[in-house]
């Protein structure tokens, strides 16, 4: 799903499953966010996060993913299941300014996994082509995502 057109199609398809016929405010918000995602080359990173969450879910690994730096208020992230915050349910919050400004930088991600499932999670991260570095045993915290090239992000855990 790393190609932007495929990514965009997936976002709209999933949004239609959630909202039905897309209200103008939802379509406008998705358009704005997708423009920023494309402009700032965030397609691969977000597609990787979708794959990670899907892989964890398919293996029955409960995870709690926290996004910071504005990505946590993204409708795209919500629609794709990366974030649980739906900005459309909170119209009183002006979240667009965070999205516009922060899509220029990679999000800070914290992924908490039970200690006894770390080996399984490491295998999933390896299968996704992510380099895993851990100083000590404990919950996984993705502290930093480093953009390497058009096809890869390194996650520092």
Model regions and ranges:
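Alpha-helical scaffold/interaction cores of sigma-54-like transcription cofactors
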Residues: 1-157
């Amino acid at each position: 799903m790393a190609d932007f057109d495929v990514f965009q199609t997936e976002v709209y398809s999933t949004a239609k499953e959630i909202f039905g016929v897309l209200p103008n405010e939802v379509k406008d918000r998705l358009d704005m966010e997708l423009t920023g995602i494309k402009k700032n080359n965030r397609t691969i990173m977000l597609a990787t996060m979708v794959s990670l969450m899907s892989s964890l879910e398919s293996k029955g690994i409960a995870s709690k993913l926290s996004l910071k730096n504005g990505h946590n208020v993204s409708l795209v992230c919500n629609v794709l299941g990366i974030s649980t915050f739906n900005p459309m349910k909170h119209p009183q919050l002006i979240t667009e300014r965070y999205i516009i400004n922060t899509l220029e930088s990679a999000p800070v991600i914290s992924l908490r996994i039970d200690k006894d499932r770390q080996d399984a999670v490491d295998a999933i991260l390896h299968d996704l082509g992510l380099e895993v570095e851990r100083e000590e045993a404990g919950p996984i915290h993705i502290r930093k995502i480093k953009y390497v090239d058009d096809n890869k992000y390194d996650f520092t855990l």
